[in-house]
């Protein structure tokens, strides 16, 4: 399952780590998608909530995928559920116009 961490970005915010777990120990930077409580209903968003370790309804914003230093990640607060992986795939396809 993909982990959700708090990360020190423009401010401390939750992020979904997209870099595969197998290679993370060898990298100094990881790819993440910021999580926000601003829900716009875009095809590039994945809905999250308490089941993901978040205190309120939020979305993964696949329009804002970034690379961050691994040491910017603070602590794991939750994870993406297996049932949400398909929505993540669709959101990434939409964000990068892969369809």
What is each PLM-predicted segment?
Residues 1-99:
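Conserved functional hotspots at enzyme active or ligand-binding sites that engage polyanionic ligands
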């Amino acid at each position: 399952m993909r982990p959700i961490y708090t990360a020190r970005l423009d401010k401390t915010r939750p992020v979904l780590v997209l870099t595969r777990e197998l290679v993370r120990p060898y990298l100094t930077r990881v790819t993440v998608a910021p999580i926000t409580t601003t829900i716009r209903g875009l095809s590039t968003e994945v809905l999250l909530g308490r089941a993901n370790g978040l205190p309120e309804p939020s979305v993964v914003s696949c329009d804002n995928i970034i690379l961050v230093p691994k040491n910017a990640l603070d602590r794991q607060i939750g994870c993406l559920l297996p049932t949400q992986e398909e929505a993540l795939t669709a959101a990434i396809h939409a964000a990068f116009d892969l369809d």
